Amino acid sequence: MKKGGEDVRVDKIKVQLLMTKGPHTQQELAAKAGISRQTLSAVMNGRNCRPELLGKISKALGVEPKEIIE
C-alpha cells in the first residue's frame, strides 16, 4: 500500500488470476469481501480504491494488499 493511506488502483489482471482459484465470480468475491458487486466492479474497472476497501478485497482473495495493486 502507498504511504499515507492514499487511494490506489487494483490490478484487474492480478485479481482475475486469483479469482480462478476462488471465489470465481465478482458476485462471490464481493460477498466474501462484504462489499457490493457494483463497488467491486467499479474498482475492477479502474476506480481508485481506499485502503480499507483494498484490505477487504485482498483478504477475501487470501493475499496481501500489495499483491493486487498496480
Protein language model annotation of sequence segments:
Residues 26, 37, 51-54:
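Helix-turn-helix DNA-binding elements, focusing on the entry/boundary residues of the two helices
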Residues 62-70:
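Short C-terminal boundary/hinge segments that cap the last helix of small helical domains
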Residues 19, 44, 61:
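DNA major-groove recognition helix of helix-turn-helix
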Residues 35-49:
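Recognition helix of helix-turn-helix/homeodomain-like DNA-binding domains
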Residues 29-30:
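Short alpha-helical "recognition helix" segments of helix-turn-helix
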Residues 46-59:
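Short, basic-rich loop-to-helix N-cap that marks the start of a DNA-contacting helix
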Residues 1-25:
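A short, Lys/Arg-rich alpha-helix, primarily the initiator
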